[in-house]
Each structure stands twice: as structure tokens, then as C-alpha cells.
UniProtKB/Swiss-Prot annotation:
Matching SUPFAM superfamilies: YggX-like
GO biological process, one term: cellular response to oxidative stress
GO cellular component assignments: cytosol
UniProt GO molecular function: iron ion binding
Protein name: Probable Fe(2+)-trafficking protein
Family: Belongs to the Fe(2+)-trafficking protein family.
Function description: Could be a mediator in iron transactions between iron acquisition and iron-requiring processes, such as synthesis and/or repair of Fe-S clusters in biosynthetic enzymes.
Domain of life according to the entry: Bacteria
Length: 90
């Protein structure tokens, strides 16, 4: 049986993550309040940030930047949009 969480991003009950995706307090907060669906959205957004900003995950500053963006994406006012990014028109 899967666990459910009141997803902070989706604003509704949804299937929760199977385990904390990160170590530490931030990983615990994500595990307790983010659904699998919202986490997949973050992974897509994180990939865009890495590619558009040409981040190297070997760089500690890049990892710190992504952690701050993750916090903003779920618990703040939203993550940064890459420079020049225009969301697709539906």
C-alpha cells in the first residue's frame, strides 16, 4: 500500500515518495510534503536549469544553487526561470 501526502505543490492528496530524495532536513521536508507527481515535475525543471545554465554537478556551488531552487520551487515563491526562457503556449 502506498502512502499519501497532502502535496504542497499540487494542493491535493496524492501518492507520496517512497523514500526521502535527499539527505538532511530538506530531504525530510520534501518526503513529508511532496507527491511523486510533483517530484517528477521538479526533476524536469531541474534538468532544464542544469542545461540552460550549463551547470556542472561536480561544482559544489551548482549543487548548492539547485538545493536553493528546490526549496524555492516547493516551499517558496517559485524557482528561477532560466534567462530567455519562454514557457510553451498551450
Amino acid at each position: 500500500m502506498s502512502r499519501t501526502v497532502n502535496c504542497i505543490k499540487l494542493g491535493r492528496e496524492a501518492e507520496g515518495l517512497d523514500f526521502p530524495p535527499l539527505p538532511g532536513e530538506l530531504g525530510k521536508r520534501v518526503y513529508e510534503s511532496v507527491s511523486k507527481e510533483a517530484w517528477q515535475g521538479w526533476l524536469r525543471y531541474q534538468t532544464m536549469l542544469i542545461n540552460e545554465n550549463r551547470l556542472s554537478l561536480a561544482d559544489a556551488r551548482a549543487r548548492q544553487y539547485l538545493a536553493s531552487q528546490l526549496d524555492a520551487y516547493f516551499f517558496g515563491q517559485g524557482a528561477d526561470a532560466p534567462a530567455g526562457y519562454t514557457p510553451p503556449q498551450n
